[in-house]
Amino acid sequence: MILSVIIPCYNESKTILSLIEAVKKSPVKNREIIIVDDGSKDGTRDILNQLNDPEVRIIFHSKNKGKGAALRTGFSEAKG
């Protein structure tokens, strides 16, 4: 069984990397991390584009659609 961790984010340039690291420190090994950037305008997108981590999948919304939409996008892509 795989655990899917969905992280919706909007303008989280100051916190997104520490959030990812916190999830990766969990004892659960069979997991996937899905980040849905909901149209960030503060550099979050640039940070995520530079992230080279096979455990993290990133999905971008072209514009802000709200937290619920970001979660639904993540759920639709989740394997767990």
Which residues does each predicted region cover?
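Structured catalytic core of nucleotide-sugar glycosyltransferases
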Residues: 1-80
